[in-house]
Amino acid sequence: MLLILCLVAFRNLRADPVKWGTTTTVAPGGWGRMAALTNGNWLAVSTVFPAGTNSYLSILISSNSCRNWTAIARVQVAGRTLDNGELVVLPNGNILLTMRSLIGTTSFLLPVYVSADQGRTWTYLSNIDSSSGPGGLWEPDFLVLTSTLAVFYSNEAHPGFSQLISEKISTDGGTNWGAEIWAVAQNGGGSLRPGMPQIVRMANGNYILVFEVVNSGNADVSYKISSDATTWAGGLGTHIPCQHCGPFVTAVASGIVFLTSCENQVSFSRDFGATWQRLETPPWNLGFNFSWPALYNTGSNELAAMVTWGGVNLRFGNLVPLAPWPNPFADNFNGGTDTNWTRYDGNFGFASGTYLLNDAGTNGKALTGSEFWADGTLETDLLISTPGNAGVVFRMTNPDYTGPDAGFDYYAGLDTGGFMVFGIQSNAWSQLATTPMTVAINTTYHLKIVMQGSLFKLYAVDMNTPKVTWTNSTFARGQIGVRAFQCNASFDNVSFTNAVPTRLNVAATNGQLTFTWPFAPVNVKLYSATNLQSPLLGSPVAISPSLVNTQWTLPVQQPAASRQYYWLQGR
């Protein structure tokens, strides 16, 4: 009998898969977008705003991986204002350019131009849509499908809808356009304004459409998923945390999806949009500004972040191999840093080897670990120095900085009112349990949370008898972190042991083992060993999983040994 133990244990991958580096200027104008040509060059479009006349589009080319740019053409129409340029390269090598073209509030067009000579000359081809106002047409975005071409755009021309996102399909390379499809619209109409659409095909074959929703928060960013890029669920999609206004999305071959917006932060998803994390280091330190950013996969291991700020500029980043999270994970903050932690709101500091959350009158949290951690034991030493409550979060996904309960997670903490509290945060607070205990100010308490499936045991001071035992299955996986609510608190000796992510599944048929797992295999290998050691030591058995029905799948020959261990490990 063959005994197969699938660990996947602790070998999940550390955050920030991009290391930002050099910058370059593309053009002195505004609103930049790019496209990769079939010969390896890149083409860019930028808006030029000359004094005393209407704006026009400048076309630029780079032959050295986007480092240097030369203007080669312009597209200009007398009496019309042009902006929001968008490029796409067709399978036959032709390049299409679309844009918004308007005369005040009386004429709106989305014209299409074609170039057959690498962008040096342009010929009018067609018009996607038109409006005589006052509702306008804005921000077109192309998508090449298997045998057709799609375009998405913001549309103000429908009565009863402040704005919606329209889609049209061309079956002849942009010469003619089919009937309008409503990709995103407020159910029943109203004042909400979905717009600025961007779409990309992910590594699992599905398409993700991202967009802003003006009059919802600060132009909150949301997304929809489609298997064919033409069939869309109703409504306004699913919110993406930490991003607002003017989103842009791209996907890389490894499976990671990257997203940015006018927050000028970059978020990434390793599970095709189900959960999102924010990079600790942004490409540009602009804060929230109307920079109309974009992201491009400019090389096999390179991501470029484009912003319009003092001209159109690019910053290049290396897609770096992600180091494995250690098991156990531990941080005592003795170095006076919180490397590998991501801060959300709040005020942070360090003193005497402790992590300070100085949040009297406010709130804040800091997160670390893998978004795929599921079971394990979380511990910390906690001292609260002003009235309020503080504690730990776990199984957190989609964290945001828009309030004390922004994210999806469990929270266990101590309150100086004299109790331990356990609850759920899902952009709102839902209390599960409390138990009375003495919580004195300026006194250190040791907390321990043991999580196994839907069972949670919460310990404080006494590590033998849990103060709270509770069953709840709301959240299955996520990061860990520390949180302070309306108080100053310090944390020390944070640890997470026996970390287990979502399961590595295995099926055995006809002498073959087939492993599947639901997240992106970025720089990982499947490892195997006949004996367990600490740390795990083994040999790689394969490196090239494939996508089958949204699961990463990797077949290997059934081993001869009677006992075999398998796990995923960072390269």
Indicate where each model-derived feature is located:
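Asp-box/BNR beta-propeller loop motif
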Residues: 16-22, 60-72, 113-126, 169-181, ...
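Hydrophobic core segments of beta-strands in well-ordered, beta-rich domains
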Residues: 33-51, 84-104, 111, 139-161, ...
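Short tryptophan-centered beta-strand motifs in secreted/extracellular beta-sheet-rich domains
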Residues: 333, 378-380, 443-452, 456-460
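Extracellular glycan-recognition surfaces and repeat-rich motifs
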Residues: 334-366
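Secretory/extracellular carbohydrate-interaction modules
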Residues: 359-425
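Short, aromatic/His-centered strand-loop micro-motif at the edge of beta-sheets
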Residues: 425-446
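Short, solvent-exposed beta-strand-to-loop segments that form ligand-recognition rims
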Residues: 460-479
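Short, composition-biased motifs enriched in small/polar/acidic residues
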Residues: 498-571
